[in-house]
Amino acid sequence: ESSVVPPTDGVSTTTDVSRVHFDHVDFTYPGADAPVLCDVTFTAEPGRTTAIIGSTGSGKTTLVSLVPRLFDATGGTVLVDGVDVRRLEPEVLWSRIGLVPQRAFLFSGTVASNLRYGRPDATDDELWAALRTAQAEDFVRAMPEQLEAPVAQGGANVSGGQRQRL
């Protein structure tokens, strides 16, 4: 049974600001003797780059996983736009977050079909804007078919860095 449960009185809206704040956050994996994260406090401001730096096993991925509630903090609070993520409706929370896993995976199809996976109604202009944001516009424009360029299963026909940006 999941320890992450939807709220009974969930908040269904947030602002368009998308500020993420960790307020004295702790996290301990079930059955672990020691916490992975201890008293972490910081704010990730919209439009700014926030770097999470640490050695292997230091909790970087765990920290990022707390925002979309892949896990819930065992202490402290994770807030999006001032609202505790545990109070946000899951659909609202997930619609506000773009999570790029360490091992990126692409489906067989086209650049456009992969980009539209999470939002089928996205326009070509919106796809180009997303590619700009991900610093992928230049290499996609260099492909002969651009948005309609074929993508092999798993993204085998693009580099690891390109795969992650897509």
Walk through the language-model features, giving the residues of each.
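ABC-type nucleotide-binding domain
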Residues: 4-7, 11-166
